[in-house]
Design a protein with these regions (language model features):
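Short, intrinsically disordered, charge-balanced linker/junction segments flanking boundaries
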Residues: 1, 76, 316-325
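A conserved hydrophobic secondary-structure block that centers on an alpha-helix together
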Residues: 1-5, 10, 24
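An aromatic- and glycine-enriched ligand-binding surface/loop that stacks and positions planar moieties
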Residues: 7, 14-15, 52-232
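Short, glycine/acidic-rich hinge or "gate" loops at secondary-structure transitions
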Residues: 25-37, 81-84, 108-112, 291-298, ...
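Charged, glycine/proline-rich intrinsically disordered loops and linkers
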Residues: 26-52, 227-236, 319-322
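C-terminal substrate/ligand-recognition segments
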Residues: 193, 198-308
Length: 325
């Protein structure tokens, strides 16, 4: 089958699913049973048995809308645009439609960029809990330490499997919003991690950082006296000078004498992802400040909100973003 045929079939399947799936699994009262089921004599007890909160975590209408946005931005991309099945305007429309279920631009959750280590939030989630604002689709919240076992540095009994690269670290701007290569960045090569985008410290473990239940200091330098150092032990020590922090619970202890597990929130689709899909599509379609696809916000509005959430800018302004827009 061609890409065009596959795209058409997948979108058709999504549309068919939307005819039957609720936007969100929730219990209803007798007078809230959707008309198409009430007309067939369904009671609220029967409706709730099929579409109630006990089914949360399964595919619902909001997840399908997110799938459509993901597929459309893929189809509009340079890799598949020649198939002619979706434009960037189409992709923006699908993303905006999905986001409308979450308040549009209000889908930007102030704490959403740190969802994976929000202990009080995660510990309060049950199987039938409503998703946090940041999350469209998630897996079950369960106690584990497998991510930490894979990714903690070896001094903390981890395998150090994921090593962020230098170009990823360099992509994080300064706290004032400017790229580190910009003359206005005030970047200090001798203190490369000072005054950086707060997301750098939240997502990547750099030399001298602390992590783990015992707050162990990680020395990932080439002259490190520990196994955390650059290329100290094949298969465990970092090959780049960095270790992953994102997705990990910093309160997990892997010490064999006092091993602990913690609950994890596996986010499969986040509202931030769909917001960025919209921003990309809207910008490509009509530029940074156009409202596209029925949305009342632009690519610029999305990027500004996400950067502001992370704490970028100075004195409440984001001069670098204004230069770009």
């Amino acid at each position: 089958n061609t890409f065009k045929e596959c795209y058409a079939q997948i979108m058709s399947d999504f549309d068919e699913a939307l005819k039957y799936l609720p936007e969100q699994y929730t219990d209803v009262n007798e007078d809230q049973v959707p008309a198409k089921y009430a007309q067939k004599g369904a009671t609220n007890a029967e409706y709730n048995r099929a579409f109630g909160i006990n089914h949360r975590g399964k595919i619902d209408g909001r997840i399908i809308s997110a799938f459509k946005a993901q597929l459309a931005i893929l189809a509009a991309s340079p890799a598949y645009a020649s198939a002619g099945v979706a434009s960037y305007e189409d992709a923006a429309k699908y993303a905006a439609n999905c986001l409308s279920e979450f308040g549009g631009l209000d889908a930007v959750d102030p704490d959403g960029w740190k969802w994976f280590c929000n202990k009080s939030l995660i510990d309060g989630l049950g199987a039938t809990s409503e998703n946090p604002k940041e999350i469209i689709w998630r897996g079950n919240v369960e106690e584990s330490n497998s991510l930490e076992t894979d990714c903690y540095p070896p001094s903390l009994y981890g395998s150090g499997k994921i090593n962020p690269t230098q170009n990823l670290v360099d992509a994080f701007p300064m706290a004032n919003g400017y790229p580190i290569t910009d003359a206005n960045a005030e970047y200090d090569a001798k203190n490369p991690y000072q005054n950086r985008d707060p997301r750098l410290a939240a997502y990547i473990l750099v030399n001298g950082d602390k992590i783990g239940a015992t707050d162990g200091v990680v020395n990932s330098a080439a002259d490190s006296k520990t196994l955390d150092g650059l290329n100290k032990e094949n298969g465990k020590s970092t090959k780049t000078g960095y270790y992953l922090r994102k997705l990990l619970r910093p309160d997990v202890n892997l010490n064999p004498s006092s091993t602990t597990k913690q609950k994890h929130l596996p986010a499969r689709i986040r509202t931030t992802e769909i917001l960025l899909d919209y921003a990309e599509a809207a910008n490509e379609a009509q530029g940074p400040k156009a409202n596209v696809g029925g949305a009342n916000y632009s690519a610029y509005d999305v990027i500004k909100a996400i950067r502001k959430r992370a704490g970028l800018g100075e004195s409440g302004e984001d001069p670098y973003l204004e230069e770009c827009a």
